[in-house]
C-alpha cells in the first residue's frame, strides 16, 4: 500500500479552506490525502484555529483518515510535502480595500486583480511567494506548487521567471465558472460542454465552445447578449454586453473583460458601490465575519452554503481536480496557468499563459492554439507586457519599473495619474513593500 499524500496549504486560515477540505473528502478514494497542513501567519492565527477546528470536525464526520495539522511554522509544514497550495493575502483584506479605494479617488477602476489594485497586490505578493519557493526547493523539492493566490497570472509569471521551481501551476476558478455559465445558458448538463480556453489569468477567452463535440460558439455568443446570462462572478458587476459587439468579438469573454470593454460603466458602478454598500473588499469583510461566526459552531461539520457568497465558487473543484489529475496521471484536459512554450504564438515562450492543458504526472502539457484572433490579441499582449514589467518591479523594488507597469496598464489614463496613484499606494502599503523602501532609506 502506498503512503498517503501530504498536502500543505499556505493561507490555511482562509474562509475558502472548508471548500478545499470538502473537495479532498469527496475525492478520498482517488486522492488519498493522509496529512493536510494548514499554515498561516500570526495575524491569521485566530482564523486558522477556527477554520482548522471545523476542518477536523469535517473529516471526522466524513470518516476519512486525514490528519489535519495547524501551524504558524511554514518550514516545519513543508518538510517532505507532495503538493503545496497557496491561497494567501499579504496585508489581508484591509490592503485589498486600499487597492480598491485609492484608484477610485483618481477616477480609475479599483479592483483586486486589474489595474492599479492588481499591480499592488502583485508587488506585495511576489516577494513572499518567491521566499516560499526557496523553502520548497530546500524542504520538498519534488512537490508541486499549485498557486491560487491572486493575481494568479502575474504570480505564476514571477515563479516561472524568478524562482528555480519547475513544478509550478497557477489555478483560477474563472474557466470553470465560464463552463458552468455556458451550460446554464444552453440549459444542458455541464459534462456535455467543452470550452477551448486561451489567454491569460483573468484575461482568458473561450475561442470555441463545444456541446457533445459540436461547436455551438455562435449560439453561446447569442445567449451572452441576453442580460439573464450575465456569466459573471460574485465580485464583478454583470453590466450588460452589447450583443453586436459580442458577435464582432467572436470569442467568449470572461467576466473580467468588462473592466476593459465596459470601463465607463464598471467605474460608475464601483463609484456608486463605494458610497453605498462599500467596495468589494469591504463587502467581503462583512461576509467573512459572518462565515467565521458560523465556523465557530461546534455542531457545524460540513461546508456551510453561505460560503458561496464569498465569490470562490468551484475553487475546490479546480484545485482538487488538478491535484488528482497529476497524482493519477489522468491525461484529462484542464485550463491552468503554465509556461507558454509556444502554445500561444503571440506571447513570449517563457511567460505564463492560461490555456487548456493535458494533465499528466509530469505536469500540464499545453494544447497549442497558434495565434489569438486579432480582435483580442493586442489586449492580451498589452496585459502580458504589464505583467512582465510588474513582476520585474516586484523583484527589484525599482520605482521607475513600477511606474512603467502602472502607466502601460490600459485601465490607467495617463502617466501623471499613474504617478499620483503609485506614490499614494506605495505609501499606503509601505509595511508590505520593503523592496522599495529599504533601498530608498539605505
Curated annotation (Swiss-Prot):
Induction field: Induced by lichenan, lichenan hydrolysate and cellobiose. Subject to carbon catabolite repression.
Site (Increases basicity of active site Tyr): residue numbering on this chain: 112
GO cellular component: cytosol
Binding site for Mn(2+): 172, 202
Enzyme class: hydrolase
Catalytic activity: 6-phospho-beta-D-glucosyl-(1->4)-D-glucose + H2O = D-glucose 6-phosphate + D-glucose
Cofactors required: NAD(+); a divalent metal cation
Enzyme Commission number(s) from the entry: 3.2.1.86
Disulfide bond sites: none
Catalytic residues as annotated in Swiss-Prot or TrEMBL: 256 (proton acceptor)
GO biological-process terms attached to the record: carbohydrate metabolic process
GO molecular function, one term: hydrolase activity, hydrolyzing O-glycosyl compounds
Binding annotation for substrate: 96, 150
Keywords associated with the record: Carbohydrate metabolism, Glycosidase, Hydrolase, Manganese, Metal-binding, NAD
Binding-site residues for NAD(+), renumbered to this chain: 5-73
Function text: Hydrolyzes phospho-beta-glucosides.
Sequence similarity: Belongs to the glycosyl hydrolase 4 family.
Protein name listed in UniProt: Probable 6-phospho-beta-glucosidase
